């Protein structure tokens, strides 16, 4: 047994060689909002995986789970004799459940998140914008992308009874804005604070400055800016992008599964060969991209990004009326969420539309 595995075994986070598997409890103490839960190997998480394999040529969800178990064992994250990712996570859940102090449990939650952050980066070393959002490509090519890695990390943490999910990033740690151009995991720790975990960064905990998340009180999506504790990555509260409204951290929730399914289809459309981002868009490519974007909008009509991109694609296809309709709808969604990207103004200008939303931030 390696020193690393021995240390984890002492902490109760993996089982030492020869130990049997504890039976999994039937009830989970973690209470999450509607549509927020997708713990590892649950029906909610497996749907993400099966959707991916449906898009792939061959393979099945069992291939992904088999790869995960093998990679867990090869990395020494799973102790010899257990060999299953699920068993490892369940052992850590049991250890977390024995911690009475919210502060100490929060520290242990962050330690597990950091361990999984390292494991994902080392086991899936290839970051691919083109294909890394498909779970089928984890097993085939060891690829990942920001949405996939964040959903996977959140699912593993949820299985350990940690309140975790995914949020979009519209302003990174350096202050650069984008149109929801990145995804990270959000951990709502037991001591009442939050942290962001980004498997695209060398360090597990990051200080991104603008997020797109779910407001549990208003029941809608909104843009917020985290308020950090000094120079640490600990989030103590949130505020609106104009700093006019202070938002307690508890009502701010991760994005729901409808939104996440929508976002997977958005990336499938965005990365379609011959689509809008291609150097040489084709009629067939644009039609296929529009198909995925419509599927994305259908999964979550309140996700503004696919609505915006659908408007741009339809404009390129010379479907002028439909393009204007989608761009107008996107403008309303962004405005309601509290932030408008400058790219929307440019798209509406190209479509000869009057821009009625507030002045956008650069993106």
Spans of model-derived segments:
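Canonical positions in the second alpha-helix
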Residues: 295-296, 330, 337
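Amphipathic alpha-helical repeat scaffolds of TPR domains
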Residues: 214-278, 302-316, 341-351
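Hydrophobic/aromatic-rich core segments of domains that either
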Residues: 151-222
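Secondary-structure boundary elements
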Residues: 51-138
């Amino acid at each position: 047994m390696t020193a690393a595995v021995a240390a984890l075994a002492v902490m109760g986070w993996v089982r030492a060689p020869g130990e049997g598997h504890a039976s999994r409890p039937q009830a989970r103490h973690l209470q999450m909002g509607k549509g927020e839960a997708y713990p590892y190997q649950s029906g909610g998480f497996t749907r993400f995986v099966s959707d991916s394999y449906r898009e792939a040529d061959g393979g099945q969800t069992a291939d992904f789970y088999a790869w995960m178990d093998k990679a867990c064992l090869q990395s020494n994250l799973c102790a010899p004799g257990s060999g299953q990712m699920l068993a490892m996570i369940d052992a850590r859940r049991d250890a977390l459940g024995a911690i009475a102090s919210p502060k100490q449990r929060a520290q242990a939650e962050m330690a597990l998140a950091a361990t999984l952050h390292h494991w994902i980066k080392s086991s899936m070393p290839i970051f691919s914008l083109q294909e890394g959002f498909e779970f089928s490509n984890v097993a085939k090519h060891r690829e990942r992308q920001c949405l996939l890695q964040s959903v996977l990390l959140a699912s593993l943490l949820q299985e350990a009874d940690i309140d975790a999910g995914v949020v979009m990033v519209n302003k990174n740690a350096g202050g650069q804005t984008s149109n929801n151009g990145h995804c990270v995991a959000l951990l709502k720790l037991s001591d009442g604070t939050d942290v962001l975990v980004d498997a695209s960064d060398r360090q597990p905990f990051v200080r991104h400055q603008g997020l797109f998340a779910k407001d549990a009180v208003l029941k809608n999506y909104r843009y917020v800016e985290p308020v950090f504790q000094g120079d640490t990555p600990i989030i103590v509260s949130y505020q609106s992008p104009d700093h006019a409204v202070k938002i307690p951290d508890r009502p701010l929730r991760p994005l729901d599964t409808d939104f996440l399914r929508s976002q997977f289809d958005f990336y499938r459309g965005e990365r379609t060969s011959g689509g809008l981002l291609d150097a040489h868009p084709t009629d067939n490519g644009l039609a296929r991209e529009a198909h995925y974007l419509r599927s994305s909008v259908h999964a979550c009509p309140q996700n503004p990004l696919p609505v915006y991109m659908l408007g741009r694609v339809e404009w390129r296809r010379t479907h002028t009326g439909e393009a204007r309709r989608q761009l107008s709808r996107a403008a309303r969604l962004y405005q309601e969420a509290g932030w408008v990207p400058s790219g929307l103004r440019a798209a509406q200008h190209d479509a000869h539309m009057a821009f009625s939303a507030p002045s956008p931030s650069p993106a």
